[in-house]
């Protein structure tokens, strides 16, 4: 089955890829023979036309069919030969066609392919009509067979004739090819190279690429063999980083404090405390920053009023508590004397002992609690031993 598909990748110009599915060996061999026969017939017609033009004899029947114009007949024969060669070895060229334009031609593998004479006649008629139209200055009448043959056998002519539209980029311009020109089939030797004349390759290079850099060497080295493979869309002009909608791709906003200051953003802030900040480069997103950058207290700061936290003294803290300092003998003597008088201290006595021993009221209260617990343990131990 022969298929001609126009793909629409994400390129500047649409690219045409011609795929040939080798349904059976006999059909493929017969098609090749027909193409060779068409090329031979076209070459014979060209030779006859040239002989008739040079020797002054009677024109060839192909020339007579073209209206006695020997140049038209020669052009038709040459076009038929080129069309046969192009139909046999098609390569993928970026054709500046309309995005919606697509053409598909198929022939079932079981059907008999057209004969060589019919193919040559159709190609010659199409080329003769085109030459007559160009010589007369107007669009000459073209039959359906000629248009069909022109569309089917001249895929590369669209790229060569599009001088008004933007020039498409060739293979190797972005570091990767467009599409492979290969014959797909079950046989291992199904992939064949697409050979074209050096003049056509040079004209294509002069028109569609800059031949001043290393790309020219690559193109010239591949002018005779274009059996390359498509490397994917990795090097395409549209294959760049595109941010996913709903996500913001930008670096972290630096802190508003000093270089050594740590930021602790409070959790659960309402959206009213944020104001939108327009982003550069035209991104369709907004970043929200708090209006007031508050500095909450450190988590390890003690809740006691008499404890002062210092970052330099962090090693002396344990879970936010001050390191235990044993009481002096003078302090213990004053506390023991008051405990012997009364095991439960009053508010006035607590203030007096705090002022005398240079201890806080909380420390005095805790000492009395611990002293009662200690005495209780001692009494319980004596009871158990006795």
Swiss-Prot record:
Transmembrane residue ranges: none
Annotated compartments:
Nucleus
Summarizing the annotation, the consequence of altering residue 370 to A is: Decreased DNA binding and transcriptional activity
- Protein name (database record): Homeobox protein Hox-A13
KW Hydrolase (keyword) present: no
Q: Which GO terms describe its cellular component?
A: chromosome; intermediate filament cytoskeleton; nucleoplasm; nucleus
Q: Give the range the annotation lists for the signal sequence.
A: none
From the record heading the sequence, give the disease linked to this protein.
Defects in Hoxa13 are the cause of hypodactyly (Hd), a condition characterized by profound deficiency of digital arch structures.
State the function annotated in the UniProt record.
Sequence-specific, AT-rich binding transcription factor which is part of a developmental regulatory system that provides cells with specific positional identities on the anterior-posterior axis.
Q: Which organism is it from?
A: Mus musculus (Mouse)
Q: What Pfam families does the record tag this protein with?
A: Homeodomain (PF00046), HoxA13_N (PF12284)
| Keywords tagged on the record | Developmental protein, DNA-binding, Homeobox, Nucleus, Transcription, Transcription regulation
Q: Which InterPro entries match?
A: AP_axis_regulatory_Homeobox, HD, Homeobox_CS, Homeodomain-like_sf, HoxA13_N
The record, for PROSITE patterns, names:
HOMEOBOX_1 (PS00027), HOMEOBOX_2 (PS50071)
Biological process per Gene Ontology, one example term:
tissue homeostasis
State what changing residue 373 to A does.
Decreased DNA binding and transcriptional activity
- DNA-binding residues: 320-379
Question: What broad class describes the main subcellular location of this protein?
Answer: nucleus
Query: What outcome is documented for mutating residue 366 to A in this protein?
Result: Decreased DNA binding and transcriptional activity
Which family does the entry's similarity section mention? Answer: Belongs to the Abd-B homeobox family.
């Amino acid at each position: 089955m022969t298929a001609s598909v126009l793909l629409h990748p994400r390129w500047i110009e649409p690219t045409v890829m011609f795929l040939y599915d080798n349904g059976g060996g006999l059909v493929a061999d017969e098609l090749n023979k027909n193409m060779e026969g068409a090329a031979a017939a076209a070459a014979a017609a060209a030779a006859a036309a040239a002989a008739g033009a040079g020797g002054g004899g009677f024109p060839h029947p192909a020339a007579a069919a073209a209206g006695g114009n020997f140049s038209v007949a020669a052009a038709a024969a040459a076009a038929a030969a080129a069309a046969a060669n192009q139909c046999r070895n098609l390569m993928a060229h970026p054709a500046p066609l309309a995005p919606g334009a697509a053409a598909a031609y198929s022939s079932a593998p079981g059907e008999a392919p057209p004969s060589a004479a019919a193919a040559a006649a159709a190609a010659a008629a199409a080329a003769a009509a085109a030459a007559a139209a160009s010589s007369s200055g107007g669009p000459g009448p073209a039959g359906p067979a000629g248009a069909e043959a022109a569309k089917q056998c001249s895929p590369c002519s669209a790229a060569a004739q599009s001088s008004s539209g933007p020039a498409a980029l060739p293979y190797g311009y972005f570091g990767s090819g467009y599409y492979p020109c290969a014959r797909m089939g079950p046989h291992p030797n199904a992939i064949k190279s697409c050979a074209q004349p050096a003049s056509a390759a040079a004209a294509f290079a002069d028109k569609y690429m800059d031949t001043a850099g290393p790309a020219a060497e690559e193109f010239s080295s591949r002018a005779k063999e274009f059996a390359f493979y498509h490397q994917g869309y990795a090097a395409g002009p549209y294959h760049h980083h595109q941010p996913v909608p709903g996500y913001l791709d930008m670096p972290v906003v630096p802190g508003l404090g000093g270089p050594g200051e740590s930021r602790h953003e409070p959790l659960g802030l309402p959206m009213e405390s944020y104001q939108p900040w327009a982003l550069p480069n035209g991104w369709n997103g907004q970043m929200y920053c708090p209006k007031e950058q508050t500095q909450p207290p450190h988590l390890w700061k003690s809740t006691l009023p008499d404890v002062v936290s210092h970052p330099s003294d962090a090693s002396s803290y344990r879970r936010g508590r001050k390191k235990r300092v044993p009481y002096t003998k003078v302090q213990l003597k004053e506390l023991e004397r008051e405990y012997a008088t009364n095991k439960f201290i009053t508010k006035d006595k607590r203030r007096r002992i705090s002022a005398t021993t240079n201890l806080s009221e909380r420390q005095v209260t805790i000492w009395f609690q611990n002293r009662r617990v200690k005495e209780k343990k001692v009494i319980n131990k004596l009871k158990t031993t006795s």
